């Protein structure tokens, strides 16, 4: 149950913040963007180093090279874990494979979902590290769904005819945490 989340990026960060607010997340949200003063009315930090402490959870939606550096810095801060939404790793070929290895070499103890994934929704604790509008609400029970596919998990999250969900994870490349 994260007390705080750091959100790295621009437009996708805005959506994650909106989704967390919509769900009723009560913890602190720390947007990180060196080019913006605020996102969704919340003051931005310029870098990982400017955060007050290692965040409990993070959402990373920046280009590949900065994503690797962010993961390295979050690991050094003993941050809890996070989602790397960033694509362009091994799914794009040899160059991406090298970058994914570099990501892995820097992840350390940082629990990472992805890269190249939609993220996770925790309906129980009201947190959505997920860059899309989603449906669903937590009625006190529900299934946990883990998929490799972002599109499948997104379709399930917006369906009003299926069973309720407690947790939803799109695992993407599964570089660190795997199915």
Language-model-detected regions and their locations in the chain:
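Catalytic-core regions of core metabolic enzymes
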Residues: 1-179
């Amino acid at each position: 149950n994260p007390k705080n989340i750091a959100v790295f990026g621009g437009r996708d960060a805005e959506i994650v913040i909106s989704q967390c607010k919509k769900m009723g997340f009560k913890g602190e949200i720390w947007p990180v963007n060196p080019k913006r003063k605020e996102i969704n009315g919340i003051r931005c930090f310029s870098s990982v180093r400017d955060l007050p402490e290692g965040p409990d959870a993070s959402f990373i939606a920046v280009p590949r090279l900065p994503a690797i550096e962010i993961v390295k810095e979050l690991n050094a801060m003993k941050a809890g874990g996070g989602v790397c939404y960033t694509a362009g790793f091994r799914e794009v070929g040899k160059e991406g494979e090298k970058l994914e290895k570099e990501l892995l070499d820097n992840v350390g103890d940082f629990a990472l979902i992805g890269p190249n994934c939609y993220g996770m929704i925790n309906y129980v604790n009201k947190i959505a590290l997920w860059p899309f509008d989603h449906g669903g609400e937590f009625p006190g029970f529900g299934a946990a769904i883990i998929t490799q596919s972002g599109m499948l998990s997104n379709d399930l999250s917006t369906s009003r005819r299926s069973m309720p969900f407690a947790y939803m994870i799109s695992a993407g490349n599964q570089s660190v945490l795997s199915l």
